């Protein structure tokens, strides 16, 4: 949705603003965060904002089939590593094998076509930075959801704070007249906002029941659908090696589930 839009910053801000509006009424029915959780919410708001900034930059230089597998497929390795270091979560041999597949898939995507054009190199760099932000906020949010009274309370506050921060940034960068009409908001942002809120609420709930790396890995199986969308709908030329790499990343994250 963001990749196919004209102004990607405004499109992402539309979706984020609507996510905040969805979360806003919910905060009146959930407990206030503790001081510890407030700190995590402040940190993750910065991380979510950084993620969106670099995602927009990545899509400015590369296609969905190149950027999305790198950004999303790279995160489970980092999340699993953080889970081991911070929480003592261990991985099965199958999970380790999955990580190897993910790594090989990422390398294949990052260095295809003899290194790629200058734009592709920039897209690769920004996508890998995006993966770092995804892994960071996923880890922080997983810990925050466990510390909060309920994971859904954490999600409600997260979307309100994240939406306020990124919308303010987008207004500062683009101004109040840049496609902020109600019709534009609803058309560009509502479907993505609803999916984002529901999906991430389920992800954080799952992270209170299972290791962070495993949940993150299952979430990132969407790289296969992104590869298909980029080829069939956006008409991006992936090439056989890129398609195989995307499938390798998907197979890897399934193995990580163990």
Q: Where does each model-flagged region fall?
A:
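Juxtamembrane helix-loop-helix junctions in multi-pass membrane proteins
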Residues: 1-18, 136-161, 214
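Hydrophobic/small/kink-forming positions within alpha-helical transmembrane segments
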Residues: 24, 45-53, 73-81, 135, ...
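Small-residue-mediated transmembrane helix hinge/kink sites in multi-pass secondary transporters
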Residues: 3, 56, 83-84, 142, ...
């Amino acid at each position: 949705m963001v990749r196919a839009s004209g102004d990607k910053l405004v499109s992402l801000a539309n979706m984020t603003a609507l996510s905040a509006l969805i979360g806003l009424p919910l905060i009146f029915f959930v407990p206030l965060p503790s001081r510890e959780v407030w700190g995590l919410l402040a940190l993750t708001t910065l991380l979510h904002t950084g993620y969106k900034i670099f995602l927009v930059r990545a899509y400015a230089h590369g296609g969905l089939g190149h950027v999305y597998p790198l950004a999303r497929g790279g995160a489970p390795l980092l999340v699993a590593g953080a889970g081991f270091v911070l929480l003592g979560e261990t991985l099965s041999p199958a999970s380790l094998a999955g990580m190897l597949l993910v790594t090989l898939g990422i390398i294949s995507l990052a260095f295809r076509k003899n290194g790629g054009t200058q734009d592709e190199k920039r897209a690769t760099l920004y996508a890998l930075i995006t993966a770092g932000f995804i892994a960071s906020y996923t880890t922080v949010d997983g810990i925050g959801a466990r510390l909060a009274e309920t994971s859904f309370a954490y999600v409600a506050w997260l979307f309100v704070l994240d939406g306020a921060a990124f919308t303010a940034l987008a207004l500062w960068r683009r101004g109040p007249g840049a496609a902020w009409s109600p019709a534009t908001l609803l058309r560009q942002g509502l479907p993505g906002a609803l999916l984002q809120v529901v999906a991430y609420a389920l992800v954080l709930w799952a992270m209170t029941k299972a290791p962070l790396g495993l949940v993150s890995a299952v979430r990132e199986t969407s790289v296969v659908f992104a590869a298909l969308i980029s080829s069939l709908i956006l008409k991006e030329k992936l090439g056989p090696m890129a398609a195989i790499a995307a499938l390798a990343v998907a197979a890897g994250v399934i193995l990580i589930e163990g």
